[in-house]
Amino acid sequence: LENDVKVNTLNFPQFQRGPNLVTSVINSIIWINKIVKNLEEHKPDAVIVLGGDDFSEYYSGYKIIIRLYQFYKISQKLPVFLIGHTIGPFYSWRKKAFSILMSKCRIVTRDELSFNHCKNDLKVKHVEQGHDLAWFDLPKQSNYLKYKMIKKYGLEENKYITIIPSALVKHYTSNSEDYFNSWKKLIEKLQTEKYQIVLMPHVCSDIKKDDRWAINEIAKRLLSKNNIIFIEGMLLPSECRSILSCGHFSISCRMHSAISSLQTAKPTIALSYSIKYAGVISGDVGMPSLVIDATDEKLWENGIVEIINQKVSHIENNYNEITNSLSKRVDEIKDDENNILNRYADIINENKGRPFSE
């Protein structure tokens, strides 16, 4: 940031859910109005919402309308920029709702699928295609941190496979036993190979089940923990990326851990549960061969382990080609996204806090 840029911490009011739908809607409107007032009092040059999934029905469901209304209200008072987002896909009346309520916002998607959805289906005027922000280097990302992390966990560079399961079991299958047993079978298969296995959490939470819980459930089922490293503590994003960057490849249920691996030119096998994987990994970085659509319950009953093993063979047989392609494409993405962000910085400086007219 420039030296004259002020950084404020905003104390937004806590949303109070009501005892029924009507009360919850009323409380939402009151809450949104308080947020808008809070923002206005600080007189920002812009409101910038950094992506990902804030405007995806995969996570918000019917509640997406509250989020759209929130940014409609903010955009009436201040310029709003959505940078690096997956948009939708929206269906039914929500398509029109997005088109109307977000008409003043400036949107940069993180992939071509979202861009086309905005232009062709949602009829959004002010949208352009960008990239996921995770393609940039992270604060503290360095060779020093890489070697510090592998030393901490007793790892040897390029001699381990990192596995990132997810606590979002229901995104893959309604049967948690199938989910955890599939991971057990996969790990026991990989244990017979020449690599160490590292089980690493990506999302940690003190208030709900997180990836550490998923790792613990897998660990309970393993017949042998030989040659397996369990990372149990919370890690900074740069620490996660350091571990991924020193491994041979990774297998991930979390898209941003998959991106962190790819960002350092290390292959990943991404187990997809939403369209964002197709947009960001298959599309933007051009690696559809590394993505598995893993939302079919029958796969978790029988078949997912074999499909992952086929991807492992694909990586091993094409390792240099994949890593060289990744290195080139990531550099292209960084350059393009830098140009996009610099252009929007100029727009923000010229606009000086005025809301867009349309």
Predicted regions and their residues:
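Active-site anion-handling motifs in enzyme catalytic cores
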Residues: 1-358
